[in-house]
A protein has these predicted regions:
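Residue-level detector of intrinsically disordered/flexible regions characterized by low predicted structural confidence
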Residues: 1-11, 36, 43, 79, ...
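N-terminal Skp1-binding subsegment of the F-box domain
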Residues: 1-30
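A generic structural micro-environment signature
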Residues: 7-9, 30, 99, 118, ...
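Short, T/G/N/S-enriched strand-turn elements that build extracellular solenoid repeat scaffolds
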Residues: 23, 33-34, 50-55, 69-75, ...
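Concave beta-strand-loop units of leucine-rich repeat
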Residues: 44-49, 62-69, 82-89, 101-108, ...
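LRR N-terminal entry segment and analogous cap-like coil->beta motifs
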Residues: 19-21, 30-84, 97-101
Length: 185
């Protein structure tokens, strides 16, 4: 599939008509595009085994729907990535990434890039891996099941912890917003 150079957005949604749906049923796909956002939430995507988004174009934001759980190659210039509920694959994140949101089933070892400033785990996240937070992280949100020891970044300004968090932590002096058990402190 080759997307025209003047494409601004690539959208494949469950509710699109069959004639408008992008045929993503082949085993391997490459997206060569000039769009800056990609949103994929189509049941046909589950047939893809590998998805490559070529980095020489200007894709800055990618959102995958809840059914997406395939291997992906991300562009080097990506800044925002949202992975849906069922995504649980090993993934290499680009050094340009600033915003990252994981869905509820993600539970893989991961190396976070130093460029990351916003990290969110879905409210129902079942993430149980050790994690090293980047030094530049300013916003961190964990879901209600997160309950593991963690060392917070000295640059952290916003922290949200769910009802299941019962660890002692040292809060950095930079912290200006703390939400714990959904109540602002």
């Amino acid at each position: 599939m080759i997307i025209p150079n003047d494409t601004i957005y690539l959208i494949s949604d469950y509710n699109c008509s069959v004639k408008d749906a992008i045929n993503l049923s082949l085993l391997n796909k490459e997206i060569y595009d000039n769009c800056n956002r990609i949103y994929l939430n189509n049941p046909l995507i589950t047939h893809i085994k590998n998805l490559h988004i070529i980095s020489k174009y200007n894709v800055k934001k990618i959102t995958f729907g809840d059914d997406f759980n395939q291997l992906i190659t991300l562009p080097n210039n990506l800044t925002h990535l949202t992975l849906g509920a069922r995504f649980d694959q090993l993934i290499t994140l680009p050094n340009s990434l600033t915003h990252l949101t994981f869905g509820e089933y993600f539970n893989q070892p991961i190396t976070l890039p130093n460029s990351l400033i916003h990290l969110t785990f879905n409210e129902e996240s079942q993430f149980y891996q050790p994690i090293d937070l980047p030094n530049n992280l300013t916003h961190l949100t964990f879901g209600c099941y997160f309950d593991h020891p963690i060392t917070l970044s000295n640059s952290l300004t916003h922290l949200t912890l769910g009802v299941g968090f019962h660890q002692s932590i040292t809060l950095p002096n930079s912290l200006t917003h703390l939400i714990f058990n959904k109540d602002s402190v």
